[in-house]
Amino acid sequence: AGLFDLIETVAPYVAALKTHVDLVDDWSPEAWGRFCKAANEADLLIFEDRKFADIGKISRAQMSGIYDVRSWSDLVTAHLISGPDVVDGLQAGWKDANREGGVLLLAQMSSRGNLLNPDYTREVVRTGCAHDGVVGFIGNGSRPEEVSALRDAVGEEKMIWTPGVNLAVGDGEMGQRY
């Protein structure tokens, strides 16, 4: 019931729901299908924050898997550490399900000690801006100056999403920064 209450509460104020499907304790295909239907009826995108990072062939297979992410997600996150084929694999996964979706590449992270340095960020932006399957980038919501620099690098053609935003600035649990 909690997820359905969430849809009802936030639908008028947000465009997408960020999920971590593998953290849903009582997950079942039937219940998740009802959740996705309710989100769709509320005109909400479902954004699975899976952070795919493997080669294209494996990423494509992961889009099916036990959770069949390709059948219900509108957006997914991915690291570009394995190269641009990860995006091709994710797009192929959606195509296998006769759907379309978009990839948000992690250009920055708000977690303490992460290894996404400025050189990596530049390469992610360069590669992502050239790929039609990439709809945007994840920026560091805890550092406005970094998000501003990311916007300058990305331009206006792609979105920047900033998880890690919280009304209380500071450190959260296990390295999360707000």
Predicted regions and their residues:
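Short beta->alpha connector loops
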Residues: 23, 29, 81-83, 141-144, ...
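Conserved anion-binding
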Residues: 53-140
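Short acidic active-site motifs
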Residues: 2, 6, 58, 62, ...
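Acidic (Asp/Glu)-rich catalytic clusters
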Residues: 5-13, 32-42, 67-70, 91-99, ...
